[in-house]
């Protein structure tokens, strides 16, 4: 919005409009306005979701001067609207009205960040660009297999309907930039292109969360790629290359689902769950390795070794 208010909406099923049996608080208020009320604490229950501690939107409200939630529970025929003010110091009583059970469900949340407290004048172009990038992330990792999900930003649909189209946004179309793609099952998919400037680059997701710094999931896939490529090159070229010589040529795109993932911080930039606890396995195929080699990785790695040997000679 022009005044810096941020709005998010989802036209899936609404939130149950009922009081929580244990806390005697309306469930939407509990979800959005009370800290540490997540249902994802129980580590004995295997989940492949991103949220865990129940902070999320509550932190947004704490750093906002105003917030509002709306949801339609079409099963109960109810609409719920509630406002929050003063950095979550004030939680207004909800307004609950009856609606026809034929009403389309939805959930909408909005908040106006406390720009003064954050030392900002408002949203700048870089922040808006980051929001748009995150919306593209959501479109890329959303399951479109059952029903095509439309994802939009500022009233414009995002032209991303799967992970491969997301890769296109980084490296261009397949005609512009060669890349190799593979998926083993619904929990693992990945693509490799040549890294710009021969510097390893990764774009990865765990349970829909963008892990900017990578993590054990990236190490898991890259470990297989570098090890298998080293063996492949040694067999065909009789040259030993280092895993580093392979890695620095690769740009990896990875999307995976991991059971009860853990991260090094609340920002969830780095996933540190060991591979033994992923809840699934992924084996990079020999065909995928051969295609990466032919992408140019093998020739460059061999050239680097030969250049080093000539320099030493």
Residue ranges and their predicted role:
Residues 5, 29-40, 108, 191-203, ...:
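Active-site-adjacent bridging/hinge elements
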Residues 92-96, 129-140, 144-269:
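GHKL/Histidine-kinase-like ATPase module
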Residues 13-17, 33-40, 64-72, 114, ...:
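Non-catalytic alpha-helical coupling and interface elements of nucleotide-dependent molecular machines
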Residues 2-22, 38-169:
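GHKL-type ATPase core
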Residues 243-311:
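Extended, well-ordered alpha-helical scaffold/bundle regions in very large, multi-domain proteins
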Residues 4, 24-28, 51-59, 63, ...:
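Helical mechanochemical/support elements of P-loop NTPase systems and associated helical scaffolds
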Residues 13, 20-38, 81-102, 125-134, ...:
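Extended active-site and interfacial segments that coordinate phosphate-rich ligands
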């Amino acid at each position: 919005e022009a005044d810096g208010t941020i709005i998010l909406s989802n036209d899936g099923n609404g939130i149950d409009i009922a009081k929580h049996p244990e806390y005697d608080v309306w469930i939407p208020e509990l979800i959005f306005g009370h800290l540490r009320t997540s249902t994802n604490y129980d580590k004995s229950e295997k989940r492949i979701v991103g949220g865990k501690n129940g902070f999320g939107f509550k932190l947004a409200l704490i750093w906002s001067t105003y917030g509002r939630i709306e949801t339609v529970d079409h099963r109960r025929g109810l609409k719920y609207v509630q406002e929050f003010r003063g950095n979550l110091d004030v939680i207004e009583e909800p307004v609950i009205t009856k609606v026809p059970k034929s009403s389309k469900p939805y959930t909408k949340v909005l908040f106006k960040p406390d720009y003064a407290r954050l030392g900002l004048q408002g949203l700048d172009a870089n922040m808006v660009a980051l929001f748009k990038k995150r919306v593209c992330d959501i479109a890329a990792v959303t399951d479109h297999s059952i029903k095509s999900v439309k994802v939009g930003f500022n009233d414009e649909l995002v032209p991303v309907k799967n992970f491969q189209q997301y890769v296109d946004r980084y490296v261009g179309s397949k005609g512009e930039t060669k890349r190799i793609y593979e998926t083993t099952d619904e929990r693992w998919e990945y693509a490799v292109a040549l890294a710009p400037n021969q510097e390893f680059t990764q774009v990865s997701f765990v349970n829909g969360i963008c892990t900017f710094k990578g993590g054990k999931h990236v190490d898991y896939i890259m470990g297989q790629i570098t090890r298998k490529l080293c063996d492949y090159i040694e067999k065909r070229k009789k040259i030993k290359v280092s895993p580093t010589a392979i890695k620095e040529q690769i740009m990896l795109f990875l999307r995976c689902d991991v059971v009860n993932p853990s991260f090094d911080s609340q920002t969830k930039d780095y996933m540190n769950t060991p591979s033994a606890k992923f809840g699934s396995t992924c084996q990079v195929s020999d065909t995928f390795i051969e295609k990466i080699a032919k992408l140019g990785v093998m020739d460059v790695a061999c050239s680097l070794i030969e250049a080093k040997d000539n320099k030493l000679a």
